[in-house]
Amino acid sequence: ADKEQADPSCRPAISGSVSDMSAYDTVFIGYPIWHGQAPRIISTFLESNDFSGKTIVPFCTSHSSGIGSSDSDLHSLTSDSAVWMNGKRFSSSSDRSEITEWVKMLNLNIQLPTTANRDVSSFDLASGKNGSAPTVMLNSGYEMPILGLGTYSLHGDTVKNSVTAALNHGVRLIDTAYMYGNEKEIGEAIRASDVPREEIFVFTKIYPGEQFENPEKAIQDALDTLDIDYIDMMLLHHPGANDVKAYLAIEKFVEQGKIRSIGLSNWYIEEIDDFIAQVNIKPALIQNEIHPYYQEKEVVEYMHNLGIVMQAWYPFGGRGHTGAMLSDKTISNIAESHGVSAAQVILRWHLQRGIVAIPGSSNPDHILENISVFDFELTDKEMEDIAALDRNEKHDWY
């Protein structure tokens, strides 16, 4: 890396890319100062994209010096019509409020999309491929993979091996909770992985009772136990006494940048409107029991209309019911016609309904199978046939 930095002509390869750069008017570019300059990979990024007419806002995270000439050295790498704003250095102690004030002072007139005009009821499934799920934009402004790994009932080396296998197979969404008792092991697996932290979206949940009564401690305990710098989304596990108090506490951690998005688990129509009226940040996601035998059509439509993403736990029906669902004749016949498994049909059905799914598994082969649902599509008739299986049959008490 030092050799690359010493060569101004060096252009390290970038493993990923920004989709549809034309959709952005303003681009923030952050980097550490390296020998008084921006890392050469920033040059690669600037030369790989068209910044014509865009506003570019540089910032750095140097611990010693200011941004200096590191940003002006980059100006020649973009078109003359690109507008460069003055850069700023942030220290390691900078918090969200300092960054927010800086952005306000820039007077950029950034128009953020609202939940009213953001459609979260369907996904761009054509952009996915086996081993790489597409993402959905949350109302918090963060992108989240639409297919992941649930870790309920997985513990010790089993959960560590499951998370490792999932990450190796391309899964980038991991769900856990305080009540699962496996946050520590999941954090260890993520830290041991070669996958960059920013590519992994991690859920956890705090539980009614003591955690809702003292939410600040519960939230900090989750951050400390996972030990992965920040939590992508924290959910309230289900309604209970002090749930508004707990949610408002999470909002404070969002302001500090330690939690990125907030959601709810096991919330329904009769509860959501009253709850939203008492908080400041609208939930980005609701995680409920949803599967072919309990389809929650009204709830899904209602939450989607609020701009809230829906996520299914128990996508295969849950404990004691998975076998029956996977052997369901309707589902099995559809699976046979596509040359895929019944589990893959069920997951594809969720995704085509605009519902994120987090199937749990400790079997690496099943984990790979579950992330491989982007090379076939269910017909309208097949979607209708599965919709007809709805029995309003809830398999858990939430």
List each model region and its residues.
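A short, structured active-site edge motif that brings together acidic residues
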Residues: 58-62, 86-92, 197-210, 232-239, ...
